[in-house]
């Protein structure tokens, strides 16, 4: 990662996506 904040946000959104997906809800932008 070249930008730390972008990396943190990417990891944050991935975790949030996984949590909501586990709850049966899709949320947040898709991050690679």
From Swiss-Prot:
Keyword tRNA processing tagged: no
Record protein name field: Calcitonin
Single annotated GO MF: hormone activity
GO cellular component, one term: extracellular region
Family: Belongs to the calcitonin family.
Chief location bin: secreted
Sites of Proline amide modification: 32
Function: Calcitonin is a peptide hormone that causes a rapid but short-lived drop in the level of calcium and phosphate in blood by promoting the incorporation of those ions in the bones. Calcitonin function is mediated by the calcitonin receptor/CALCR and the CALCR-RAMP2 (AMYR2) receptor complex.
Keywords: Amidation, Disulfide bond, Hormone, Secreted
Compartment(s) of residence: Secreted
Keyword Disulfide bond in record: yes
Naturally occurring in which organism (per UniProt): Sus scrofa (Pig)
Top-rank taxon: Eukaryota
Disulfide bonds: 1-7
Name of the gene this protein is made from: CALCA
């Amino acid at each position: 990662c070249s930008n730390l904040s972008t990396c943190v946000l990417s990891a944050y959104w991935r975790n949030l996506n996984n949590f909501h997906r586990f709850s049966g809800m899709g949320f947040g932008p898709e991050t690679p």
